[in-house]
């Protein structure tokens, strides 16, 4: 053995030791970040859960149905046509793949916002129990299968009359954009998936995941951190911070399921729940949280108004000062609109504004969302879902909840009570 070997070994170890000591000394002291634990904030009995999950479903459907007749209208046009909307009204509008599937449907009828609640519920309950963790590829394949079923039904139509074909085409076309993204995702084709996702609905930062996120929050009740992560995982159609908003929408719904929760505790999710650390993003920070800050400022400014509105508004049941405050809030929100109304950032902003301005009151919040216009049925559906989960079915406006249940079951053919039972059984049995 070389006599110098022990000396060389000692020399190397000494250098490494000094290097380690130097590295430790030069490392700047900083706090250790630990991801928040995904824990339940409260426990729900089976009966409590059923009331809240049904409240979520029906509350969302009420919002969808109230906004559907004036979807994409400017608020001035809503006031000219209907005054201030406080109830369910007939859908005097043509059918479309994303909208109602029939012309001039009865009051209480709904659009794709409610169809998505149905579809995600069927995905969540396809197994005996709600899985501990959701699988995005399973979700993609589920949507592909649904699209293929609609395509097969179209091919099987033998009719001279075009109406049956046109009707089935609407059902297939509704899922067409989604299926084009889901297929390469399920197949693991990263390039094709990124290309199709980035041109999904024209490449807009759409509110795709927000359409089904409340239901994910509903199956992870009182566990906003877990709900966020599961919804984020299934947000495969989202671009950019729209995916963070999808997670937050689920998280707000999950917290809304907690007994005794306040509206401010629900919206506080925007800064309390951040498992993927969007708040630590360089240069930008967390845009979804900035929307929360914007809304808090807007509502505070609007509530300062003390001069009554001079012009009455047909259908508005509040005071002249309350109308002036509402108009001020709308005016301030106008400065924060996106180019396309169904941009996730705009839907998120309007949802927060509705909840904060109405201080968690279901009726007032949904009215706020509907009467602003733009993509009002989607905003009202998200707001209605969150506050429906908060208050529960039994505390929703009686006439509207009963009308919505009946129309949904008998005309739309979506039985909301049955969906709630399926989710409850999958969760508790």
PLM feature segments, named:
Residues 1-2:
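N-terminal secretory signal peptides that target proteins for export/translocation
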Residues 5-14:
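Sec-dependent N-terminal signal peptides
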Residues 18-429:
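Structured, active/binding-site neighborhoods that engage oxygen-rich ligands
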């Amino acid at each position: 053995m070389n006599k110098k070997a022990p000396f060389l070994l000692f020399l190397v170890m000494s250098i490494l030791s000094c290097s380690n000591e130097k590295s430790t000394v030069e490392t700047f002291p900083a706090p250790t970040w630990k991801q928040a634990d995904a824990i339940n904030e409260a426990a729900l009995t089976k009966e409590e859960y059923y009331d809240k999950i049904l409240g979520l479903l029906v509350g969302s459907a009420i919002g969808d149905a109230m906004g559907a007749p004036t979807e994409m209208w400017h608020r001035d046009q809503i006031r000219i046509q209907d005054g201030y909307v406080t109830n369910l009204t007939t859908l005097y509008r043509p059918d479309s793949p994303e909208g109602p599937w029939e012309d001039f449907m009865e009051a209480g009828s709904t659009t794709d916002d409610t169809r998505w609640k149905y579809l995600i519920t069927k995905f969540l309950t396809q197994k005996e129990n709600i899985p501990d963790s959701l699988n995005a590829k399973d979700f993609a394949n589920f949507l592909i299968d649904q699209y293929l079923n609609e395509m097969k039904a179209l091919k099987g139509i033998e009719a001279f009359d075009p109406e049956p074909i046109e009707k089935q085409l609407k059902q297939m076309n509704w899922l067409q954009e989604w299926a084009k993204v889901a297929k390469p995702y399920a197949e693991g084709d990263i390039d094709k998936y990124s290309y199709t996702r980035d041109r999904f609905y024209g490449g807009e930062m759409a509110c795709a995941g927000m359409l089904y996120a409340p239901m994910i929050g509903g199956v992870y009740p009182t566990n906003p951190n877990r709900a966020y992560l599961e919804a984020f995982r299934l947000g495969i159609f989202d671009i950019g911070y729209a995916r963070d908003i999808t997670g937050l929408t689920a998280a707000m719904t999950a917290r809304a399921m907690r007994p005794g929760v306040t509206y401010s505790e629900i919206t506080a999710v925007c800064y309390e729940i951040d498992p993927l650390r969007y708040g630590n993003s360089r240069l930008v920070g967390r845009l979804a949280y900035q929307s929360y800050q914007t809304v808090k400022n807007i509502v505070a400014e609007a509530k300062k108004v003390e001069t009554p509105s001079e012009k009455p508004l047909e259908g508005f049941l509040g005071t002249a000062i309350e109308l002036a405050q509402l108009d001020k809030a709308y005016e301030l929100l106008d400065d924060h609109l996106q180019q396309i109304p169904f941009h996730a950032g705009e839907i998120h902003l309007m949802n927060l504004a509705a909840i904060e301005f109405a201080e968690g009151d279901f009726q007032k919040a949904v009215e706020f969302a509907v009467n602003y216009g733009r993509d009002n049925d989607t905003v009202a559906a998200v707001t209605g879902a969150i506050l429906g989960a908060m208050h529960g079915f039994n505390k929703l406006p009686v006439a509207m909840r009963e009308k919505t249940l009946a129309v949904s079951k008998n005309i739309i053919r979506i039985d909301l009570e049955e969906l709630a039972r399926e989710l409850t059984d999958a969760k508790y049995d």
